[in-house]
């Protein structure tokens, strides 16, 4: 099962009573897996990693062996392979694809409804009937327009300071829209 894992800046995570160091390309094994208790934790919905590691590093992983799900967002597995490190922008794009591929599923609380803002160099994913977002310089905004629960249009824009300006709101077509200004 392909999943996503967040880490601190050193590609390490807290695990049990200590910190566990990971390396891309490596496979790790545990005897058992139970969410919030044992095993290696990851998530199916990409942006869920932000709940635990907002300013960390992110990887695509393969959850192997015994897999235990907590019924919410977490997965624990007895074996995990760290496949590839991804950027914050790639994480946002993967989240958009995940929502498009799973229209019937509830999506993460990390996804904003209708309006959102990203900090400088950050990301925001906004989904709604008329989504709009703003961001600080270097941020990337992801907008998903939906109709009857299906995504009908999408746009991603880098707040570069020239074509897309910090603090201005944009719609799914990349046009400036009126909305209260960012603080």
Segments the model singles out, each with a brief description of its role:
Residues 1-183:
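Short, glycine-biased loop/turn motifs at secondary-structure junctions and
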């Amino acid at each position: 099962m392909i999943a996503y894992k967040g880490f601190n800046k050193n590609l390490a995570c807290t695990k049990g009573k200590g910190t566990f160091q990971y390396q891309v390309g490596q496979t790790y094994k545990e005897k058992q897996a139970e969410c919030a208790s044992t095993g290696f934790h990851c998530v199916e919905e990409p942006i869920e990693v932000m709940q635990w590691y907002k300013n960390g590093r992110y990887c695509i992983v393969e959850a192997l062996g015994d897999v235990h799900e907590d019924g919410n967002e977490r997965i624990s597995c007895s074996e995990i392979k760290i496949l590839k490190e991804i950027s914050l922008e790639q994480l946002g794009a993967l989240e958009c694809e995940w929502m498009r591929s799973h229209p019937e599923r509830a999506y993460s609380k990390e996804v904003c409804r209708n309006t959102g803002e990203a900090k400088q160099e950050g990301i925001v994913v906004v989904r709604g009937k008329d989504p709009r977002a703003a961001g600080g310089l270097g941020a990337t905004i992801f907008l998903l327009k939906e109709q009857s629960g299906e995504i009908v249009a999408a746009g991603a824009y880098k707040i570069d300071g020239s074509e897309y300006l910090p603090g201005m709101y944009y719609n799914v077509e990349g046009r400036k829209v009126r909305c209260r200004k960012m603080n």
